[in-house]
Amino acid sequence: MARRIEAEEELLANADLVITSTHNEIEEQYGLYNFYDPAHMTVIPPGTNLEQFHPPVDDEQIAFATQVERFLEDPKKPLILALSRPDERKNILTLIEAFGESQPLRQAANLLIIAGNRDDIRDMDSGSQSVLTNVLLLIDTYDLYGRVAIPKSHRADEVPEIYRLVAA
């Protein structure tokens, strides 16, 4: 922990600008450091760009749909979306278990899991490997083939489109 604090002190001493998401973060988190300088800190609050995130327009063709539909037996069913990095704390596995154990839910909807980007699970860090391996095992355990879509990759600029696909 001491090495981490030392490294953070060095970064603060040499940074031209530190970006935080809240003023509270500037005061409470960085205020404890020796090189605390609020003049070199700015807040960019999290938020949603409503120009990008909007309901689908009438006959809008959503390109990402082809990446999803190839997994699904009945792509016309509504989608339940989980979009996160493959991290145990994100509870992707619990979602799959709930979906797998609920026949009414499986009959009513498909599950779309966007869990980060990958080429080969074996090349990922051990935490991501574990989550994704268990995702695949649960899909197999509950025989969710044709009901779960889990594309290997997406771009950040496709996220609004993914939400429109789910809302369509």
Model regions and ranges:
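Catalytic cores of nucleotide-sugar-dependent glycosyltransferases that transfer UDP/GDP/TDP-activated
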Residues: 1-168
